[in-house]
Amino acid sequence: MNRFALVLLGLSSLALADPTSPEVEAVLKRDFHARGQATLDRIPQDGLQRLCTESGNHPPAAIAKALEGDQLRSIPYPEGSLIGDWKRGEKIAQGGRGLTWSDKPGAANDGSCYNCHQLSPAEMSYGTVGPSLRGIGKTRGNGPDAQRYVYGKIYNAKAFNLCSQMPRLGASGTLTPEQIKDLVALLLDPASPVNR
């Protein structure tokens, strides 16, 4: 953690905007209110997010590589197969439930993957913030290396791209290891709609 603090200190001169400026604080206080499980603790950036903000999503390459390595080493890969059930994975990917004020606390969350990615050819509407994942199992295969990569990317995308916009679905506790394995199956199983 000390190395991380030194990195942030060293990059403070790269700040493009002060995310805690009085104007931003005023907007946050005016527009965001805690309600149910949707609390205000989600708003402050953690150290990695702040580093990316302050560097315009382009921190020095050596620093990004070192921090990505730290993030990669923090991923707790489960024992055995990383492939779950693609049918459950499809429900998780297409569902938009979880961590909002109207959701029941403690209920299983969904991944909302469709908000950022195209998953299957049949989808009529999908987000384009992230890359299309259509046919990913065909292009990457579904062996142990592909499974490990996809599991890790879903668990903590910042291990592969420090300034990724993809949420850290496992590291944040949003999804369980079993749910992530189901998403791995959706993306890599040849029988899933993603790869048909």
Indicate residue ranges for each PLM-predicted region.
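Extracytoplasmic electron-transfer domains, predominantly the class I c-type cytochrome c fold
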Residues: 23, 28, 33-39, 83-88, ...
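Positively charged n-region of N-terminal signal peptides that target proteins for export
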Residues: 1-4
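Hydrophobic h-region of N-terminal signal peptides that target proteins for export
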Residues: 9-17
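Generic anion/oxyanion-binding catalytic loop in active/binding sites
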Residues: 6, 77-78, 102, 169-172
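Post-cleavage N-terminal segment of exported redox proteins
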Residues: 16-99, 153, 186-196
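Secretory-pathway/luminal and periplasmic proteins that interact with or process carbohydrate-rich
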Residues: 99-102, 122-126, 193
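Local sequence-structure signature of Cys/Sec-based thiol-disulfide redox active-site neighborhoods
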Residues: 101-112
